[in-house]
Amino acid sequence: MGSRVLTVAALTVTASVLVTGPTALADPNAINPIAGLNGTFGLPQLHGRAQAVAQVTGMSSPNMTQNVTMIGTDLGIMWDNGRGEVLTAFGDTAGVGVPNLLQGSLWSWRSNAIVRSNDRNLADGMNFDSVVKDAVGQTKEVVPSPKIPFVEISRIPTAGVAVGDTQYLNLMSVKNWGPAGTWDTNFSGLAASTDNGENWAALPETHRPSAGGDRNFQQSAYLKDNGYVYQYGTPPGRSTLGHVARVRDADITRLGEYEYWTGKDWKKGDPAAAAPIVDGVGEL
């Protein structure tokens, strides 16, 4: 595969690791998103070379996302939309609004949400230029989820990429939450948008069931290089093995066209052939 792609893989995985570590809670119903009331104050204290400079969402954020019912958010998945704008897809998003009582949440809970930014100076944080909203003015759940335990409790984005004028999100269908750092998925799959993230259509033909070799691609990260989209994947959960596949840009929705790195070469159409390239991945 070459040292270049292996290096990129390591960087991609490193950039995707949660700073909260493998024991952080995943279940959004178990989390109070209001700073102060949940025992968190100010910015997180990081112990590596990176330092927190500003909150992006929440009541202490300069984006004032509480005004669109976005007080607490899951991972923010960022990618270039192909025109120099950064789109961010957040996972489970909570705010003060109409509660999802039947789904076990006291908060207005959406499984995913999209914001856009043209900010070029991130030294003081990332300012949002627009938010994808629903009919009542809160952040819109762009790919709906029934939020029924052991059916589908959430549909969470794990990777995004632009191919031509189309935006693609890879999302995992969470079946249920397990102990800290673990969960089960039904499948992962793509959704597509042709209007810069405003509206999305799920693509069932891209579903990877959480079994066999496809289980190693339930959570993803993308890299584009030389006409290919490289997909780095892990099983559901944290502290897992990383794998890599690739596909021609134009074939991103055609699972049969994906090639999988075996440790020696690329094998087409067989996700079970993908060999681990890295261990201990925090979360993609």
Task: Show the residue positions of the predicted features.
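Secretory targeting and sorting signals
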Residues: M1-A26
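A generic alpha-helix preference that emphasizes hydrophobic side chains
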Residues: G21-T23, L75, P157, L241
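Beta-rich carbohydrate-recognition and catalytic domains
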Residues: N29-I71, D80-I153, A162-G212, G233-L284
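Conserved beta-strand position repeated once per blade in WD40 beta-propeller domains
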Residues: L75-I77, P157-A159, Q219-A221, E283
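Flexible gly/pro/ser-rich segments immediately N-terminal to CXXCH heme-c attachment motifs
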Residues: R208-D225
